[in-house]
Amino acid sequence: MGLLHADCPCASWPTLCEQLQAGPDKDVQEYCQWSRRRLQRDDDTPVAGLRALIVGHTPLQRVRVLGNIWHIDTGGWSRGHFSLLELGSLTLANPMPGE
């Protein structure tokens, strides 16, 4: 299980870990924090070495899963709702309030 703010720039989690441990890399750090590329391209390529990668950053109406990446920012801080994901089973506690 991995957790990042926005997305993973690498094809595998171990590669990202190696890059981050090698020292500061502004491009990698910015991608992890700000990228919306996967969502914009509907890229369902999984990140190898993980069961699931949990990300946020881009508010959506519903949780969206692309490959093994779970986009769980549903705008709870604004006008949306908070999404709760049970990590053991990868099930949403309340997929969409009111439904």
Language-model features and meaning:
Residues 1-71, 75-80, 89-98:
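Acidic, His/Gly-enriched loop-helix segments that form or flank divalent-metal centers
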